[in-house]
A protein has these predicted regions:
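Conserved alpha/beta catalytic core and glycan-binding cleft of carbohydrate-active enzymes
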Residues: 1-143, 171, 177, 181, ...
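Carbohydrate-interacting/catalytic domains
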Residues: 110-111, 123-130, 134-296
Length: 296
């Protein structure tokens, strides 16, 4: 696995590298979408925050460099040794330690946006990779400031617990690890995508607006029966996160949901729901691995 800037396609022919640090088809699109920041904190663009069209365009275009095996093990990082910490990017401060000072990296950060990013990291195709300290709330500008020591005794315990729960969700749901990906709804600052295989589906809903949003979402296109119940298994908001489970009905192939302000929802339709639903139809969707489908 290599660190590479630019299109890696010539290196991913099966004879050289297995995969790369996934800047172009993960770190950069998610950073622009959620924070409007360049990954070194060298630029801020208001027009990129919540720009779902730019997000999907970048993701799909850059994913074409990967074969499925390379995509499945691509190192999906939010931060690393060469770039500012993702949590620092949430404060929209343009600069580095030599211009702003290290203290500025910790100022006005938005942990709710960080939680959104971790939810996406743990549910996106590839290998979620945590840069040491991200899970504990470490901040920092581009190196060397991003290489701060681990904050022993001063960790953000809620952020650590968030990572633990999301890692468990990643491990326990095969459709998240190696299923297909499809975007099923987009709006300004609102993104809904599905990870699915022939038997199970997980929906991830992201709202980067500072207020809750309620939307009707078509879900039948990813193999979810038109009359069934989804289980909300995880959520985040401006205060933290919740693992409380609630039922969300699907009527005529659509669900109505309210996504918290600067928050996320993860919803699941699995074997248990299909078995309990007398009206469940056999899914017509085949498992097309690394199937980057946008919107029908």
């Amino acid at each position: 696995l290599a660190e590479h800037y630019g299109n890696p396609v010539s290196w991913l022919d099966g004879k050289q590298w297995d995969s790369v640090m996934n800047y172009d088809a993960f770190m950069e699109p998610i950073t622009w979408f959620l924070t409007g920041m360049e990954k070194h904190s060298d630029d801020f663009r208001q027009d990129m925050i919540g720009n779902t069209s730019a997000f999907w365009g970048s993701m799909i275009y850059n994913a074409t460099a990967f074969s499925y095996p390379s995509a499945a093990v691509a190192m999906n990082e939010l931060s690393n040794h060469d770039h500012s910490r993702f949590l620092t990017r949430t404060n929209h401060k343009v600069g580095r330690t030599n211009t702003l000072g290290p203290e500025a990296a910790d100022e006005d950060v938005n942990k709710a946006v960080m939680r959104e990013a971790v939810v996406m990291q743990m549910t996106w195709p590839g290998a979620p990779t945590i840069y040491n300290g991200d899970e504990a709330g470490v901040c920092g500008f581009t190196d060397p400031d991003n290489r701060r020591t681990y904050p022993w005794g001063h960790e953000d315990r809620q952020m650590i617990d968030l990572h633990k729960h999301l890692i468990r969700i990643h491990k326990e749901n095969p459709e998240i690890r190696d299923g297909s990906l499809r975007g099923i709804f987009e709006d300004y600052n609102v993104l809904v995508y599905a990870r699915f295989n022939t038997e199970e589906q997980t929906l991830v809903c992201v709202n980067n607006n500072p207020q809750p949003v309620t939307r009707q979402i078509k879900v039948w296109e990813v193999g979810i029966p038109k009359e069934t119940v989804l289980i909300q298994i995880f959520s985040t908001d401006e205060q933290g996160f919740s693992t409380e489970q609630t039922e969300v009905p699907v009527v005529a192939g659509k669900m109505e949901i309210t996504i918290p302000a600067t928050g996320t929802l993860i919803l699941k339709h699995g074997k248990a729901q299909a078995e309990d639903d007398e009206k469940a139809e056999k899914s017509p969707i085949r498992n097309r691995r690394w199937n980057f489908v946008k919107f029908s």
